[in-house]
């Protein structure tokens, strides 16, 4: 919400209202210069990543978008071109929460796994 002209994540805005969590401490901390700089850095990185994914999908429309350690990030869906497949991978408890809040779409899979497990 600090830099909506740079990157506006409507899903995150919706989830903040949906999740039973007191964000007041985070909001208070967001006033510091370091926190604002960190938020700017994250917004810029997210904007760049989304641009790269969309650009790649222009020339590879049926590609797979793989989001490792996805949490509640919705970049794959935000960049969806209508043809790609989206794979969101994270720990089982994270994927369980994701399934509740962001159920997988038609060409999307939420995959529970431990990315540190070499098996």
Segments from the language model and where they lie:
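Rossmann-like AdoMet
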Residues: 1-66, 70-113, 118
């Amino acid at each position: 919400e600090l830099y909506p002209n740079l990157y506006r994540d409507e899903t995150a805005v919706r989830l903040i209202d949906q999740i039973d969590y007191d964000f007041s401490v985070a909001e208070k901390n967001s006033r510091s210069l370091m926190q604002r700089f960190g938020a700017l850095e994250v917004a810029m990185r997210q904007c760049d990543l989304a641009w790269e994914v969309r650009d790649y999908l222009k020339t590879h429309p049926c590609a797979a978008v793989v989001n490792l350690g996805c949490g509640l990030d919705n970049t794959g869906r935000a960049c969806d071109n209508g043809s790609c497949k989206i794979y969101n991978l994270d720990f089982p408890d994270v994927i369980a929460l994701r399934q509740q809040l962001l159920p997988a779409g038609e060409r999307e899979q939420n995959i529970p796994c431990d990315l540190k497990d070499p098996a």
